[in-house]
Amino acid sequence: PPGSDVANLAVFGYDPQKYYTGRSPLEAVSMNVPLELTDTTFRTNLVTLSDAENYEDKVMVDYSSDEISTDEARELIKYVNEKLGCDEYEFFGGFSYRHLMVWHNKENNFSLTPPHDISDRVIGEYLPKDETILNLMKKSYDILKDHPINKEREARGLHPANSIWIWGNGTKPNLDTYKERFGIKGAVVSAVDLIKGIGYCAGLDVLE
């Protein structure tokens, strides 16, 4: 079955075979992250992995880190960007567990697994083949597992957001607006960056 990104593009009247360039670039539009045609974007989840010693042996415990609060999550993503971001790639905070990485001047030739597809599974066979992305994920575990926010979450009986999981890659979208296609205006209401991003690209008013 199609993912929510492909499905919602179709619901808005856009043929995914013509217009789909990935999930994360639509979310980037909603987050006001400027994109170049040469950028590749990635959805970056804050996930909970088990504490197995080797990263490859860890289990995907929770792809949403107990639906982590946006305030906590943005602080963690800010920390990840400070420690791991650089001129080549950078991280941007979104909402709850849903965040963004932009890799500048990088071809979009990745095959990546959504974390919600591997709940309760050992992650080894689903890890990215790209060494840079894999190393970012591994390093994120090292810097997040003992972060004070995660220690506080564990003390409250909540799952720690102890790793990033990079997936949902794509490139800058280019949708014809509703005004161009149909000569009409419209509006969209949503709490989700994906839907808001489609709305912005379609030239619709996005109501908060």
Locations of regions flagged by a protein language model:
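A short, structural micro-pattern
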Residues: G3, T38-T40, G93-F95, L158, ...
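Terminal, contiguous helix-loop blocks that mediate binding/assembly
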Residues: P128-T132, I149-E208
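Short, solvent-exposed polar/charged micro-motifs at secondary-structure junctions
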Residues: G3-N8, H99-W103, N174-D176
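Short loop/turn segments at secondary-structure transitions that flank enzyme active sites
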Residues: Q17, S50-A52, E107, G170-P173, ...
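Active-site nucleophile/metal-coordination loop of metallo-enzymes that catalyze phosphate/sulfate
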Residues: P1-I77
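Glycine-rich, mobile lid/loop segments that gate access to catalytic sites or pores
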Residues: Y63-S163, N169-G170
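Residues in well-ordered beta-strands of folded domains
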Residues: F12, N45-L49, V102, W165-W167, ...
